[in-house]
């Protein structure tokens, strides 16, 4: 669930092939189904990214298409995320191995975000790419991470329009700067953390976590130094964190998937 323009909350419907908005003021829901020509019993809408211009980006993971909904008109634009990738035409089927390979073996989207210009960015966890869709032209561009098959996932955009993401297979945090179209990567100090999300706070530090440990990591990109925080509860399976920049000090909220709890971290420095 992600907040959008006008205070609306946007909810991907996962295997229900669509997205839903909720207006807290009226307590009303509205649902937009996927376009029928791109929908089947394997359709998965797992992520959503509201843009500053009021449109909403969300990927259909099975068809490898990115939708852009305009709630005012109800129009949905469709953008192939991997235009040159057609495994079904080669007789290879559409099932892609969702695991580490020494070489990239296909494409699978795992994370989407919108920048200040309403462009969409997405993570290609299987192909090791960061993708961008130009909001004005619809052009799709893939940028390969420096580490081969790094496993990027759960992307976010900072105040400078830089993209931050976990590199799950490379055990690193990655950043893509659209101004230079260059990457930077920072290796986590503890093996097998498997960074999942990555989000920057108002001080410039970047927070990440991995579902294979119970560690929350804070990165100072200026020095490359990490600080690790061990959660008091073990076997939490961390897949999502969020940074609250409205408080002082800032707060980091952590979803403990296996334990059904939410943790809050307030750094003292």
Predicted feature residues:
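Long terminal segments
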Residues: 241, 252-258, 264-267
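Beta-rich, blade/repeat-based domains predominating
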Residues: 1-6, 37-53, 85-117, 147-162, ...
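A generic tandem-repeat structural signature
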Residues: 14, 27, 34, 41-71
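Conserved beta-strand positions in repeat-built beta-propeller and related beta-rich domains
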Residues: 4, 9-15, 56-62, 105, ...
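A short loop-to-beta-strand structural motif that recurs across blades of beta-propeller domains
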Residues: 18-21, 65-68, 129-132, 172-174, ...
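Ankyrin-repeat and related helical/solenoid repeat scaffolds used for protein-protein interactions
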Residues: 186, 201-252
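Short loop/turn segments that connect beta-strands within beta-propeller blades
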Residues: 23-27, 70-74, 134-138, 177-181, ...
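Beta-propeller fold detector
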Residues: 30-36, 77-84, 88-91, 141-145, ...
């Amino acid at each position: 669930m992600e907040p959008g323009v006008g205070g609306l909350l946007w909810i991907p419907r996962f295997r229900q092939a669509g997205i839903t908005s909720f207006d807290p003021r009226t307590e009303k829901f509205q649902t937009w189904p996927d376009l029928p020509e791109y929908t089947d019993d394997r359709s998965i809408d797992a992520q959503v990214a509201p843009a500053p211009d009021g449109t909403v980006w969300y990927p259909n993971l099975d068809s490898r298409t990115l939708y852009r909904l305009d709630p005012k008109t109800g129009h949905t634009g469709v953008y192939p995320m991997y235009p040159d990738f057609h495994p079904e035409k080669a007789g290879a089927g559409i099932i892609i191995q969702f695991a580490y390979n020494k070489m990239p073996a296909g494409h699978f989207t795992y994370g989407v975000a919108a920048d200040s210009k309403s462009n969409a960015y997405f993570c290609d966890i299987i192909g090791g790419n960061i993708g961008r869709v130009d909001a004005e032209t619809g052009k799709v561009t893939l940028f390969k991470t420096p580490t081969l098959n790094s496993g990027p996932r759960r992307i976010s955009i900072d105040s400078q329009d830089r993209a931050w993401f976990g590199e799950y297979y490379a055990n690193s945090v990655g950043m893509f700067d659209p101004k230079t179209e260059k990457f930077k990567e920072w290796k986590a100090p503890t093996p097998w953390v498997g960074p999942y999300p990555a989000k920057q706070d108002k001080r410039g530090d970047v927070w990440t976590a991995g579902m294979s440990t119970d560690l929350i990591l804070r990165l100072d990109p200026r020095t490359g130094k990490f600080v690790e925080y061990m959660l008091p509860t073990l076997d939490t399976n961390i897949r999502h964190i969020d940074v609250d920049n409205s408080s002082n000090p800032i707060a980091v909220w952590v979803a403990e998937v296996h334990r059904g709890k939410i943790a809050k971290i307030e750094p003292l420095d």
